[in-house]
Every structure is written in structure tokens, then in C-alpha cells.
Regions:
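Active-site beta-loop-alpha junctions enriched in small/polar residues
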Residues: 1-2, 56-58, 83-87, 111-115, ...
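A structural alpha-helix within SAM-dependent methyltransferase catalytic domains
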Residues: 33-40, 44, 68-71, 102, ...
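Gly/Pro-rich active-site loop or hairpin
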Residues: 29, 64-68, 88-164, 181-182
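Active-site acidic/histidine proton-transfer and metal-coordination neighborhood
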Residues: 1-79
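C-terminal helical cap(s) of enzyme catalytic domains, especially alpha/beta-barrels
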Residues: 180-200
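Short, flexible loop/turn segments with low-complexity composition
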Residues: 172-173, 199-207
Length: 207
């Protein structure tokens, strides 16, 4: 929220009017950082080495810069649950975000987003219409491969490996025009074609 007695979130997205900056300063320095410093210490004391934040619009941590700000204040116990779907519609390049977060990615969601070029051309990407109003929304979540193609996903998984993440890709199904069963089957089949399964080579016979 934006004050001590607030009941609802208040996501500040621009620096003017100046009241917004005062809200941000209060949120971060009086609430967010102290809370997670305490929670991070508690986690470490109980043998939980990582807390993974999903960078999500509407929250204090919504992009690499805000994730790294919290990580700098709290320590490496804080990292990212990297979900590209929330970055795509904000206009970020998830591969660039992966590189920014090198060493700080602790989990990855395999989920896609499709931008509607007609609706965004008219009204931009900030959209409060219900997710079921697919035809009129600026963007919707899609099964992997239905928002971005193979080239995009090959680049994404390759950069995850290059930046030190070679673990689970957790399929998250939030595709409103495809059943869970069909979405899961298609996601598994798609990812099998783009993921790298064998260990990274330790030698290069050509170099």
C-alpha cells in the first residue's frame, strides 16, 4: 500500500506527481527492505538458501532493476523466479533480462505472452480488462510457442545456460483459449525441441 493503514496495493509506475516518489521511498525503505532483510535472515537460519521472486507488475519487484535493488539490500538469498510472460508485455526483452540477472535466477517458468498489435496500437499495454476478454485485451498469456516462436525460445534457453541456470523449466499453464491437458501436451512437445538436455561440453574439438 501507500501508507501505514493501507489495505490495498499501490503500484507506482511513474515519477510524477512527486507524491509518487514519496510513496516509493516509504514502501522500499520503511517496509520492503526491512521486511525482507528479516525474512532473508530467517530463511538462512532455517537452511533455506534461496527466496525466488516472480517479477510481476503490480508489485514492488516487477523487473530486473527492482529485483537487483532488493537483492543488493538483502543479499544473495534473494533471487528471481524468472517468468518471461510478465516481462514481454511490459516491453522487455527476456533474454536481455536474463543477462542482467546472471547468477540471480533460481527458478524459471515456461509461459508465453501474445501481444495484440491492434489493441496495443490503440490503447497501449496497461490493461485491466478481464483475462477472459481475449479479443479485446492488449495481451494474453499463451502456451509456450503460441506467443513467440522457436527462435525466441531457443535463444532464451541458450542464454539461461550461458548465464548459469541449467535447471528446471516449470511449465505454467494460464492459456485461456486452450485446455490444461492440451496446453501441457503442446508445451512439453515444444520444449523438447528447444531445450538443451546434455551437459555443456568441457572441451571444443574445433578450437
Amino acid at each position: 500500500g501507500d501508507h501505514e493503514g493501507a489495505k490495498y496495493p499501490n503500484w507506482v509506475t511513474c515519477p510524477w506527481p512527486e507524491d509518487f516518489l514519496a510513496i516509493l521511498d516509504w514502501q522500499w525503505n520503511e517496509k520492503v527492505i526491512p521486511y525482507w532483510q528479516e525474512a532473508g535472515a530467517f530463511a538462512l537460519a532455517h537452511n533455506v538458501p534461496h527466496i525466488a521472486f516472480e517479477m510481476h507488475p503490480g508489485f514492488c519487484v516487477y523487473n530486473p532493476a527492482t529485483l537487483l535493488r532488493l537483492r543488493e539490500a538483502v543479499g544473495p538469498v534473494i533471487g528471481a523466479n524468472f517468468d518471461p510472460s510478465h516481462l514481454i508485455w511490459q516491453g522487455m526483452d527476456p533474454v536481455a533480462a536474463i543477462r542482467e540477472l546472471k547468477g540471480a535466477i533460481y527458478h524459471v517458468h515456461a509461459k508465453d505472452t501474445k501481444i495484440d498489435k491492434y489493441n496495443t496500437a490503440a490503447n497501449g499495454v496497461l490493461d485491466t480488462k478481464h483475462y477472459s476478454d481475449e479479443l479485446n485485451r492488449a495481451w494474453i498469456f499463451r502456451t509456450v510457442g503460441y506467443g513467440n516462436g522457436e527462435t525466441y525460445w531457443r535463444d532464451l534457453v541458450s542464454n539461461l545456460r550461458l548465464c548459469g541456470y541449467d535447471k528446471v523449466l516449470s511449465i505454467e499453464h494460464e492459456d485461456s483459449i486452450m485446455t490444461i491437458d492440451e496446453g501441457l501436451q503442446k508445451a512439453v512437445a515444444f520444449l523438447k525441441g528447444v531445450c538443451i538436455f546434455e551437459e555443456k561440453p568441457t572441451t571444443m574439438s574445433w578450437a
